Amino acid sequence: MPGNHWYDILKKIACEGSSDIDELKGIFEKELSKRKFDSIRNIEDLIDVLERADMLSLHNVEPLRKMSSHKPKLIEALDRYGTPVSAPREPVNIYQEERLAEELRQHLRISQAFQILSAPGVAPPAFIPAAAPTPPPPQQNYITPAAFTDRKRTAVFNKISEELGRFWRIFGRKAGIGEGTMDDIEERYPRDLKSRILHLLKLIEEDDCHDPRQLLMRLCRALTECGRNDIKRKVEQIMSH
């Protein structure tokens, strides 16, 4: 895995030479808020803004590649850097996992039984009882509206706001919150990360105010997609009690 040293070298190479900053800014115009876009005066500013928006990092240097069209030295350095870019994942309905796993286990049990009965030297029985139907998975009551009490809501929001940390923008983006809205939240709470995250959670809740189940699925999906499965499991644990 390339280290911070090589990542810093890439950024330094990107800043070398003369470039049309307006042309480079235009590449990211649709992805940045107007306030951030207008604050960019040079390549150093552009790189700083991209990093603050979690669009450029040690593990994702694709924005530098977009800026490299007239910089053969940067293209060569990026090719040597070799950071893989993860393909976007399909959204996963996490509440179907248990049911699908049980269906697979049942299928394997039936297949193994028929393999044994079909083996040489094994006499087939006069009657093979049909496999007992798989009972439906128990209802996950923790995602019903009645179970989403104020106490559990507070516990879920507190857990996410206490542990999400610097992932808050990626989480917000995965939950469908716009960059401009998150800029406003950051301006409102410049030094209070927990309040920033709580405000973000309330905005997400407002979108799903009549559907607690959808809200919880949206939160858990966003946690999964921003790489915080540890928090997702804690949220599910809170809701299961």
Curated annotation (Swiss-Prot):
SUPFAM superfamilies: DEATH domain. GO terms for cellular component: cytoplasm. It comes from the Eukaryota. Keywords: Apoptosis, Cytoplasm. Residues 1-101 are annotated as: Death-inducing. InterPro entries: DEATH-like_dom_sf (IPR011029), Death_dom (IPR000488). Gene3D superfamilies: Death Domain, Fas. Component of the IMD signaling pathway and is required for the host defense against Gram-negative bacteria. Interacts with Dredd, promotes cleavage of Dredd and is necessary and sufficient for enhancing Dredd-induced apoptosis. N-terminus interacts with Dredd. Interacts with imd. It is found in: Cytoplasm. Residues 151-237 form the Death domain. The keyword Nucleus does not apply. This is Fas-associated death domain protein. The gene is Fadd. GO terms for biological process: apoptotic process; defense response to Gram-negative bacterium; signal transduction. CDD domains: Death (cd01670).
